[in-house]
Amino acid sequence: MADYQDKNVVIIGLGLTGLSCVDFFLARGVTPRVMDTRVTPPGLDKLPQEVERHVGGLNDEWLLAADLIVASPGIALAHPSLSAAASAGVEIVGDIELFCREAQEPIVAITGSNGKSTVTTLVGEMAKAAGVNVGVGGNIGLPALMLLDADRELYVLELSSFQLETTSSLQAAAATVLNVTEDHMDRYPFGLQQYRAAKLRVYEKAKVCVVNADDALTMPVRGADERCVSFGVNMGDYHLNRQQGETWLRVKGEKVLNVKEMKLSGQHNYTNALAALALADAVGLPRASSLKALTTFTGLAHRFQLALEHNGVRWINDSKATNVGSTEAALNGLHVDGTLHLLLGGDGKSADFSPLTRYLTGDRIRLYCFGRDGAQLAALRPEIAQQTETMEEAMRLLAPRVQPGDMVLLSPACASLDQFKNFEQRGDVFTRLAKELG
Protein backbone atom coordinates (compact mmCIF):
# COMPACT_ATOMS: atom_id res chain seq x y z
CA MET A 1 0.00 0.00 0.00
CA ALA A 2 1.31 3.43 -0.91
CA ASP A 3 2.01 6.18 1.62
CA TYR A 4 0.69 9.62 0.69
CA GLN A 5 1.57 11.43 3.95
CA ASP A 6 2.79 15.02 3.43
CA LYS A 7 2.15 14.77 -0.30
CA ASN A 8 0.73 17.74 -2.18
CA VAL A 9 -2.13 16.03 -4.08
CA VAL A 10 -4.24 17.65 -6.80
CA ILE A 11 -7.35 15.94 -8.21
CA ILE A 12 -8.59 16.96 -11.66
CA GLY A 13 -12.29 16.33 -12.26
CA LEU A 14 -15.12 15.96 -9.79
CA GLY A 15 -18.22 13.82 -10.28
CA LEU A 16 -18.55 10.48 -8.51
CA THR A 17 -15.02 9.34 -9.39
CA GLY A 18 -13.42 12.62 -8.29
CA LEU A 19 -15.32 12.51 -4.99
CA SER A 20 -14.18 8.90 -4.44
CA CYS A 21 -10.58 10.13 -4.82
CA VAL A 22 -11.18 12.97 -2.34
CA ASP A 23 -12.61 10.50 0.21
CA PHE A 24 -9.70 8.12 -0.40
CA PHE A 25 -7.10 10.77 0.52
CA LEU A 26 -9.05 12.27 3.42
CA ALA A 27 -9.31 8.78 4.96
CA ARG A 28 -5.51 8.64 4.81
CA GLY A 29 -4.98 11.99 6.49
CA VAL A 30 -4.21 13.89 3.29
CA THR A 31 -6.28 16.91 2.21
CA PRO A 32 -6.15 17.18 -1.59
CA ARG A 33 -6.95 20.18 -3.77
CA VAL A 34 -9.53 19.79 -6.52
CA MET A 35 -9.98 21.46 -9.90
CA ASP A 36 -12.48 21.06 -12.69
CA THR A 37 -12.82 22.76 -16.07
CA ARG A 38 -16.60 23.00 -15.52
CA VAL A 39 -17.96 25.97 -13.56
CA THR A 40 -20.45 23.85 -11.58
CA PRO A 41 -19.19 20.27 -11.82
CA PRO A 42 -21.38 17.47 -10.43
CA GLY A 43 -20.51 16.75 -6.80
CA LEU A 44 -19.30 20.28 -6.02
CA ASP A 45 -21.96 20.60 -3.30
CA LYS A 46 -20.70 17.37 -1.67
CA LEU A 47 -17.09 18.53 -1.44
CA PRO A 48 -15.97 18.88 2.22
CA GLN A 49 -15.41 22.49 3.29
CA GLU A 50 -11.68 22.04 3.98
CA VAL A 51 -10.92 20.94 0.40
CA GLU A 52 -9.67 23.85 -1.74
CA ARG A 53 -11.29 23.95 -5.15
CA HIS A 54 -10.68 25.72 -8.47
CA VAL A 55 -13.47 25.58 -11.09
CA GLY A 56 -13.99 26.86 -14.62
CA GLY A 57 -10.53 25.83 -15.82
CA LEU A 58 -7.22 24.29 -14.74
CA ASN A 59 -4.85 25.95 -12.26
CA ASP A 60 -1.32 25.53 -13.65
CA GLU A 61 0.27 26.90 -10.49
CA TRP A 62 -1.34 24.12 -8.40
CA LEU A 63 -0.40 21.48 -10.97
CA LEU A 64 3.28 22.45 -11.10
CA ALA A 65 3.49 22.58 -7.29
CA ALA A 66 1.92 19.11 -6.88
CA ASP A 67 3.70 15.90 -5.89
CA LEU A 68 0.87 13.82 -7.31
CA ILE A 69 -1.88 14.62 -9.82
CA VAL A 70 -4.92 12.32 -9.99
CA ALA A 71 -6.40 13.01 -13.42
CA SER A 72 -9.95 12.22 -14.50
CA PRO A 73 -10.12 9.94 -17.56
CA GLY A 74 -12.02 12.80 -19.19
CA ILE A 75 -8.87 14.93 -19.57
CA ALA A 76 -6.25 13.98 -22.15
CA LEU A 77 -2.69 13.44 -20.92
CA ALA A 78 -1.69 15.49 -23.98
CA HIS A 79 -3.42 18.59 -22.48
CA PRO A 80 -0.75 21.34 -22.34
CA SER A 81 -1.19 21.83 -18.57
CA LEU A 82 -0.67 18.11 -17.90
CA SER A 83 2.24 17.91 -20.35
CA ALA A 84 3.94 20.79 -18.53
CA ALA A 85 3.43 19.12 -15.14
CA ALA A 86 4.76 15.79 -16.45
CA SER A 87 7.83 17.54 -17.90
CA ALA A 88 8.41 19.12 -14.47
CA GLY A 89 8.53 15.61 -12.97
CA VAL A 90 5.08 15.55 -11.35
CA GLU A 91 3.60 12.04 -11.09
CA ILE A 92 0.25 11.71 -12.90
CA VAL A 93 -2.09 8.79 -12.13
CA GLY A 94 -5.80 7.96 -12.26
CA ASP A 95 -8.19 6.46 -9.73
CA ILE A 96 -7.53 2.93 -11.06
CA GLU A 97 -3.83 3.27 -10.24
CA LEU A 98 -4.71 4.34 -6.67
CA PHE A 99 -7.02 1.32 -6.46
CA CYS A 100 -4.43 -1.16 -7.75
CA ARG A 101 -1.90 -0.01 -5.14
CA GLU A 102 -4.40 -0.85 -2.38
CA ALA A 103 -6.35 -3.91 -3.56
CA GLN A 104 -5.19 -7.15 -1.95
CA GLU A 105 -7.52 -9.60 -3.69
CA PRO A 106 -7.49 -10.88 -7.31
CA ILE A 107 -8.65 -8.49 -10.05
CA VAL A 108 -10.41 -9.44 -13.28
CA ALA A 109 -9.76 -6.56 -15.72
CA ILE A 110 -11.93 -6.08 -18.81
CA THR A 111 -11.43 -3.65 -21.66
CA GLY A 112 -12.30 -3.48 -25.37
CA SER A 113 -14.21 -1.22 -27.73
CA ASN A 114 -17.51 -3.06 -27.26
CA GLY A 115 -19.10 -5.52 -24.86
CA LYS A 116 -17.10 -4.40 -21.79
CA SER A 117 -20.09 -3.62 -19.59
CA THR A 118 -21.93 -6.82 -20.47
CA VAL A 119 -18.88 -9.02 -19.82
CA THR A 120 -17.98 -7.16 -16.61
CA THR A 121 -21.51 -7.53 -15.25
CA LEU A 122 -21.65 -11.19 -16.32
CA VAL A 123 -18.39 -12.11 -14.55
CA GLY A 124 -19.74 -10.30 -11.47
CA GLU A 125 -22.95 -12.37 -11.67
CA MET A 126 -20.90 -15.57 -12.03
CA ALA A 127 -18.95 -14.68 -8.88
CA LYS A 128 -22.16 -13.91 -6.96
CA ALA A 129 -23.67 -17.22 -8.13
CA ALA A 130 -20.63 -18.94 -6.57
CA GLY A 131 -21.18 -17.11 -3.27
CA VAL A 132 -18.06 -14.97 -3.71
CA ASN A 133 -17.94 -11.48 -2.14
CA VAL A 134 -17.24 -9.52 -5.32
CA GLY A 135 -16.81 -5.81 -6.08
CA VAL A 136 -17.90 -4.84 -9.61
CA GLY A 137 -17.26 -1.39 -11.08
CA GLY A 138 -14.63 0.92 -12.53
CA ASN A 139 -15.82 2.44 -15.79
CA ILE A 140 -19.32 1.08 -15.06
CA GLY A 141 -21.41 1.55 -11.92
CA LEU A 142 -19.35 2.44 -8.85
CA PRO A 143 -15.87 3.98 -9.13
CA ALA A 144 -13.16 1.45 -8.23
CA LEU A 145 -12.10 3.18 -4.99
CA MET A 146 -15.63 2.82 -3.62
CA LEU A 147 -15.32 -0.97 -3.99
CA LEU A 148 -12.32 -1.34 -1.64
CA ASP A 149 -13.37 -3.50 1.31
CA ALA A 150 -11.45 -5.83 3.62
CA ASP A 151 -14.12 -8.53 3.14
CA ARG A 152 -13.86 -8.64 -0.66
CA GLU A 153 -12.67 -11.86 -2.26
CA LEU A 154 -12.59 -10.69 -5.89
CA TYR A 155 -12.76 -7.48 -7.94
CA VAL A 156 -14.16 -7.26 -11.47
CA LEU A 157 -13.31 -3.99 -13.21
CA GLU A 158 -14.37 -2.51 -16.52
CA LEU A 159 -11.51 -0.29 -17.71
CA SER A 160 -11.46 2.27 -20.52
CA SER A 161 -8.40 3.07 -22.63
CA PHE A 162 -8.24 6.46 -20.86
CA GLN A 163 -8.11 4.78 -17.43
CA LEU A 164 -5.41 2.36 -18.57
CA GLU A 165 -3.18 5.21 -19.79
CA THR A 166 -2.65 6.36 -16.18
CA THR A 167 -2.39 2.86 -14.64
CA SER A 168 0.91 1.02 -14.13
CA SER A 169 0.39 -1.12 -10.98
CA LEU A 170 -2.37 -3.39 -12.30
CA GLN A 171 -1.49 -7.08 -11.89
CA ALA A 172 -4.70 -8.74 -13.06
CA ALA A 173 -5.43 -12.36 -12.20
CA ALA A 174 -7.22 -12.42 -15.57
CA ALA A 175 -7.39 -9.68 -18.19
CA THR A 176 -9.07 -9.32 -21.56
CA VAL A 177 -9.19 -6.97 -24.54
CA LEU A 178 -12.51 -8.09 -26.05
CA ASN A 179 -12.05 -6.33 -29.40
CA VAL A 180 -10.42 -3.25 -30.90
CA THR A 181 -12.33 -1.06 -33.35
CA GLU A 182 -12.12 2.67 -33.98
CA ASP A 183 -13.40 4.77 -31.07
CA HIS A 184 -12.35 8.02 -29.41
CA MET A 185 -10.21 8.90 -32.43
CA ASP A 186 -10.55 12.53 -31.34
CA ARG A 187 -8.32 11.58 -28.35
CA TYR A 188 -5.86 9.46 -30.35
CA PRO A 189 -4.31 11.64 -33.07
CA PHE A 190 -1.94 8.82 -34.10
CA GLY A 191 -4.88 6.57 -34.89
CA LEU A 192 -5.97 3.03 -34.14
CA GLN A 193 -2.57 1.68 -33.07
CA GLN A 194 -2.22 4.39 -30.40
CA TYR A 195 -5.69 3.53 -29.08
CA ARG A 196 -4.84 -0.19 -29.20
CA ALA A 197 -1.59 0.37 -27.28
CA ALA A 198 -3.59 1.94 -24.42
CA LYS A 199 -5.96 -1.07 -24.35
CA LEU A 200 -3.11 -3.61 -24.38
CA ARG A 201 -1.68 -2.14 -21.16
CA VAL A 202 -4.27 -4.33 -19.38
CA TYR A 203 -2.14 -7.42 -20.17
CA GLU A 204 1.02 -6.11 -18.49
CA LYS A 205 1.73 -8.30 -15.43
CA ALA A 206 -1.53 -10.26 -15.97
CA LYS A 207 -1.55 -13.95 -14.99
CA VAL A 208 -4.03 -15.01 -17.69
CA CYS A 209 -4.77 -13.09 -20.91
CA VAL A 210 -8.12 -13.83 -22.56
CA VAL A 211 -7.80 -12.90 -26.25
CA ASN A 212 -10.27 -12.77 -29.14
CA ALA A 213 -9.30 -15.36 -31.78
CA ASP A 214 -11.29 -13.37 -34.37
CA ASP A 215 -9.48 -10.07 -33.73
CA ALA A 216 -5.68 -10.00 -34.11
CA LEU A 217 -5.60 -6.52 -32.56
CA THR A 218 -6.50 -8.05 -29.16
CA MET A 219 -3.27 -10.08 -29.04
CA PRO A 220 -0.44 -8.94 -26.74
CA VAL A 221 2.22 -6.91 -28.57
CA ARG A 222 4.69 -9.81 -28.59
CA GLY A 223 1.99 -12.21 -29.79
CA ALA A 224 0.12 -14.95 -27.95
CA ASP A 225 2.10 -16.69 -25.20
CA GLU A 226 1.51 -19.40 -22.58
CA ARG A 227 -0.63 -16.94 -20.55
CA CYS A 228 -3.20 -16.69 -23.35
CA VAL A 229 -6.60 -18.36 -23.52
CA SER A 230 -8.76 -17.58 -26.57
CA PHE A 231 -12.44 -17.20 -27.43
CA GLY A 232 -14.11 -16.72 -30.80
CA VAL A 233 -17.06 -17.50 -33.04
CA ASN A 234 -15.60 -20.61 -34.71
CA MET A 235 -12.07 -20.68 -33.34
CA GLY A 236 -10.47 -20.50 -29.92
CA ASP A 237 -10.42 -22.50 -26.69
CA TYR A 238 -13.94 -21.16 -26.05
CA HIS A 239 -16.08 -21.06 -29.21
CA LEU A 240 -19.56 -21.52 -30.67
CA ASN A 241 -20.64 -24.84 -32.13
CA ARG A 242 -23.59 -25.05 -34.52
CA GLN A 243 -25.24 -28.43 -35.11
CA GLN A 244 -28.67 -29.28 -36.52
CA GLY A 245 -29.92 -25.72 -36.10
CA GLU A 246 -28.73 -25.52 -32.47
CA THR A 247 -25.93 -23.30 -31.17
CA TRP A 248 -23.78 -24.36 -28.22
CA LEU A 249 -21.08 -22.73 -26.14
CA ARG A 250 -18.13 -25.09 -26.34
CA VAL A 251 -14.94 -25.19 -24.25
CA LYS A 252 -11.95 -27.10 -25.62
CA GLY A 253 -14.22 -29.39 -27.61
CA GLU A 254 -16.81 -29.96 -24.87
CA LYS A 255 -20.36 -28.58 -25.24
CA VAL A 256 -21.21 -26.74 -22.02
CA LEU A 257 -24.43 -24.80 -22.74
CA ASN A 258 -27.11 -24.54 -25.43
CA VAL A 259 -27.65 -20.83 -26.15
CA LYS A 260 -31.43 -21.27 -26.10
CA GLU A 261 -31.05 -21.66 -22.32
CA MET A 262 -29.67 -18.10 -22.19
CA LYS A 263 -31.80 -14.96 -21.95
CA LEU A 264 -29.23 -13.02 -24.02
CA SER A 265 -29.57 -13.18 -27.80
CA GLY A 266 -27.38 -12.32 -30.77
CA GLN A 267 -24.00 -13.67 -31.84
CA HIS A 268 -22.13 -10.80 -30.19
CA ASN A 269 -23.74 -11.71 -26.87
CA TYR A 270 -22.81 -15.38 -27.28
CA THR A 271 -19.15 -14.39 -27.72
CA ASN A 272 -19.48 -12.07 -24.71
CA ALA A 273 -20.68 -15.11 -22.76
CA LEU A 274 -17.64 -17.12 -23.92
CA ALA A 275 -15.27 -14.34 -22.82
CA ALA A 276 -16.96 -14.09 -19.42
CA LEU A 277 -16.76 -17.86 -18.95
CA ALA A 278 -13.04 -17.87 -19.86
CA LEU A 279 -12.37 -15.11 -17.28
CA ALA A 280 -14.44 -16.87 -14.60
CA ASP A 281 -12.62 -20.15 -15.24
CA ALA A 282 -9.26 -18.34 -15.09
CA VAL A 283 -9.89 -17.13 -11.53
CA GLY A 284 -11.22 -20.49 -10.37
CA LEU A 285 -14.97 -19.81 -10.19
CA PRO A 286 -16.91 -23.11 -10.34
CA ARG A 287 -18.08 -23.86 -13.88
CA ALA A 288 -21.57 -25.01 -12.75
CA SER A 289 -22.48 -21.73 -11.02
CA SER A 290 -21.00 -19.71 -13.91
CA LEU A 291 -23.23 -21.55 -16.40
CA LYS A 292 -26.22 -21.02 -14.09
CA ALA A 293 -25.51 -17.26 -14.14
CA LEU A 294 -25.50 -17.36 -17.96
CA THR A 295 -29.04 -18.80 -17.96
CA THR A 296 -30.46 -16.09 -15.67
CA PHE A 297 -28.65 -12.92 -16.88
CA THR A 298 -31.09 -10.75 -18.85
CA GLY A 299 -28.57 -8.25 -20.23
CA LEU A 300 -28.01 -4.56 -19.64
CA ALA A 301 -30.27 -1.65 -20.50
CA HIS A 302 -29.67 0.05 -23.87
CA ARG A 303 -27.61 -2.89 -25.16
CA PHE A 304 -29.63 -4.65 -27.88
CA GLN A 305 -32.57 -4.52 -25.50
CA LEU A 306 -36.11 -5.34 -26.65
CA ALA A 307 -38.03 -2.11 -26.00
CA LEU A 308 -41.33 -3.28 -27.51
CA GLU A 309 -42.79 -6.19 -29.47
CA HIS A 310 -46.19 -5.32 -30.88
CA ASN A 311 -48.15 -6.25 -34.02
CA GLY A 312 -45.27 -8.50 -35.11
CA VAL A 313 -42.73 -5.65 -35.01
CA ARG A 314 -39.69 -5.69 -32.70
CA TRP A 315 -38.27 -2.34 -31.53
CA ILE A 316 -34.69 -2.79 -30.29
CA ASN A 317 -32.84 -0.24 -28.15
CA ASP A 318 -29.09 -0.51 -28.76
CA SER A 319 -28.34 3.08 -27.77
CA LYS A 320 -25.07 1.96 -26.14
CA ALA A 321 -23.73 1.43 -29.69
CA THR A 322 -21.75 4.67 -29.56
CA ASN A 323 -19.17 3.59 -32.15
CA VAL A 324 -19.01 1.80 -35.50
CA GLY A 325 -17.71 -1.50 -34.09
CA SER A 326 -20.64 -1.76 -31.71
CA THR A 327 -23.16 -1.29 -34.52
CA GLU A 328 -21.25 -3.84 -36.63
CA ALA A 329 -21.58 -6.30 -33.73
CA ALA A 330 -25.36 -5.72 -33.64
CA LEU A 331 -25.76 -6.19 -37.41
CA ASN A 332 -23.42 -9.17 -37.77
CA GLY A 333 -25.53 -12.32 -38.05
CA LEU A 334 -28.77 -10.40 -37.40
CA HIS A 335 -31.88 -12.18 -38.71
CA VAL A 336 -35.00 -10.16 -39.60
CA ASP A 337 -38.02 -11.76 -41.29
CA GLY A 338 -39.17 -8.51 -42.88
CA THR A 339 -37.44 -5.14 -43.31
CA LEU A 340 -34.82 -3.69 -40.96
CA HIS A 341 -35.44 -0.01 -40.17
CA LEU A 342 -32.05 1.15 -38.86
CA LEU A 343 -31.63 4.40 -36.93
CA LEU A 344 -28.12 5.85 -37.20
CA GLY A 345 -26.72 9.17 -36.06
CA GLY A 346 -25.25 11.52 -33.50
CA ASP A 347 -21.63 12.56 -33.02
CA GLY A 348 -19.32 10.13 -34.83
CA LYS A 349 -16.19 11.27 -32.96
CA SER A 350 -14.23 11.52 -36.26
CA ALA A 351 -14.74 7.81 -37.00
CA ASP A 352 -14.71 6.15 -40.41
CA PHE A 353 -18.25 4.86 -41.06
CA SER A 354 -17.36 2.82 -44.18
CA PRO A 355 -17.06 -0.58 -42.38
CA LEU A 356 -20.86 -0.45 -41.96
CA THR A 357 -21.43 -0.56 -45.73
CA ARG A 358 -21.15 -4.38 -45.96
CA TYR A 359 -24.17 -4.72 -43.62
CA LEU A 360 -26.35 -2.26 -45.56
CA THR A 361 -26.93 -4.36 -48.68
CA GLY A 362 -30.10 -5.81 -50.18
CA ASP A 363 -33.59 -4.40 -50.45
CA ARG A 364 -34.84 -5.28 -46.95
CA ILE A 365 -33.16 -2.45 -45.11
CA ARG A 366 -33.97 1.25 -44.68
CA LEU A 367 -31.74 3.86 -43.05
CA TYR A 368 -32.94 6.81 -41.00
CA CYS A 369 -30.03 9.13 -40.22
CA PHE A 370 -30.10 12.00 -37.74
CA GLY A 371 -27.93 14.32 -35.69
CA ARG A 372 -24.55 15.94 -36.30
CA ASP A 373 -23.18 13.24 -38.62
CA GLY A 374 -26.49 12.18 -40.18
CA ALA A 375 -25.48 13.33 -43.67
CA GLN A 376 -22.27 11.30 -43.57
CA LEU A 377 -24.19 8.18 -42.55
CA ALA A 378 -26.92 8.69 -45.16
CA ALA A 379 -24.18 8.90 -47.80
CA LEU A 380 -23.25 5.25 -47.10
CA ARG A 381 -26.27 4.19 -49.18
CA PRO A 382 -28.28 7.25 -50.20
CA GLU A 383 -30.95 5.37 -52.18
CA ILE A 384 -32.34 3.72 -49.02
CA ALA A 385 -31.56 6.56 -46.58
CA GLN A 386 -33.57 9.44 -45.22
CA GLN A 387 -32.04 12.19 -43.17
CA THR A 388 -33.77 14.11 -40.38
CA GLU A 389 -32.60 16.60 -37.78
CA THR A 390 -33.58 14.52 -34.74
CA MET A 391 -34.16 10.89 -33.79
CA GLU A 392 -37.78 11.67 -32.93
CA GLU A 393 -38.43 13.00 -36.45
CA ALA A 394 -36.85 9.85 -37.88
CA MET A 395 -39.05 7.61 -35.73
CA ARG A 396 -42.22 9.49 -36.67
CA LEU A 397 -41.19 9.13 -40.32
CA LEU A 398 -40.66 5.37 -40.16
CA ALA A 399 -43.56 4.41 -37.87
CA PRO A 400 -46.30 4.36 -40.57
CA ARG A 401 -44.07 2.21 -42.81
CA VAL A 402 -43.42 -0.75 -40.52
CA GLN A 403 -45.07 -4.10 -41.26
CA PRO A 404 -45.38 -7.34 -39.24
CA GLY A 405 -42.02 -9.15 -39.31
CA ASP A 406 -40.03 -5.88 -39.42
CA MET A 407 -37.49 -4.70 -36.88
CA VAL A 408 -36.80 -1.11 -35.82
CA LEU A 409 -33.25 -0.94 -34.50
CA LEU A 410 -31.62 2.03 -32.81
CA SER A 411 -27.90 1.20 -33.09
CA PRO A 412 -26.58 4.67 -33.86
CA ALA A 413 -22.79 4.07 -34.30
CA CYS A 414 -22.31 7.50 -32.70
CA ALA A 415 -22.08 9.24 -29.36
CA SER A 416 -25.26 10.97 -28.19
CA LEU A 417 -23.91 14.22 -26.77
CA ASP A 418 -24.86 16.40 -29.75
CA GLN A 419 -28.57 16.05 -28.86
CA PHE A 420 -28.84 14.10 -25.58
CA LYS A 421 -27.37 14.15 -22.08
CA ASN A 422 -25.99 10.64 -22.57
CA PHE A 423 -26.70 7.35 -24.38
CA GLU A 424 -29.11 6.33 -21.60
CA GLN A 425 -31.33 9.34 -22.24
CA ARG A 426 -31.26 8.61 -25.99
CA GLY A 427 -32.33 5.01 -25.28
CA ASP A 428 -35.08 6.14 -22.92
CA VAL A 429 -36.46 8.54 -25.55
CA PHE A 430 -36.37 5.74 -28.15
CA THR A 431 -38.24 3.38 -25.80
CA ARG A 432 -40.87 6.01 -24.96
CA LEU A 433 -41.45 6.77 -28.66
CA ALA A 434 -41.54 3.05 -29.55
CA LYS A 435 -44.35 2.55 -27.04
CA GLU A 436 -46.18 5.60 -28.38
CA LEU A 437 -45.73 4.83 -32.10
CA GLY A 438 -45.61 1.01 -32.08
UniProtKB/Swiss-Prot annotation:
Keywords: ATP-binding, Cell cycle, Cell division, Cell shape, Cell wall biogenesis/degradation, Cytoplasm, Ligase, Nucleotide-binding, Peptidoglycan synthesis. It catalyses: UDP-N-acetyl-alpha-D-muramoyl-L-alanine + D-glutamate + ATP = UDP-N-acetyl-alpha-D-muramoyl-L-alanyl-D-glutamate + ADP + phosphate + H(+). The gene is murD. Coiled coil: none annotated. This is UDP-N-acetylmuramoylalanine--D-glutamate ligase. Disulfide bonds: none annotated. One of its GO terms (cellular component) is cytoplasm. Its EC number is 6.3.2.9. The keyword Ligase applies. The lineage of its organism: Bacteria, Pseudomonadati, Pseudomonadota, Gammaproteobacteria, Enterobacterales. Cell wall formation. Catalyzes the addition of glutamate to the nucleotide precursor UDP-N-acetylmuramoyl-L-alanine (UMA). PANTHER family: UDP-N-ACETYLMURAMOYLALANINE--D-GLUTAMATE LIGASE. GO terms for biological process: cell division; cell wall organization; peptidoglycan biosynthetic process; regulation of cell shape. Pathway: Cell wall biogenesis; peptidoglycan biosynthesis. Gene3D superfamilies: Mur ligase, C-terminal domain (3.90.190.20), Mur-like, catalytic domain (3.40.1190.10), NAD(P)-binding Rossmann-like Domain (3.40.50.720). Pfam families: Mur_ligase_C, Mur_ligase_M, MurD-like_N. It is an enzyme of class 6 (ligase). Belongs to the MurCDEF family. ATP binds at G112, S113, N114, G115, K116, S117, T118. NCBIfam families: murD. GO terms for molecular function: ATP binding; UDP-N-acetylmuramoylalanine-D-glutamate ligase activity. Its main location: cytoplasm. InterPro entries: Mur-like_cat_sf, Mur_ligase_C, Mur_ligase_C_dom_sf, Mur_ligase_cen, MurD. It is found in: Cytoplasm.
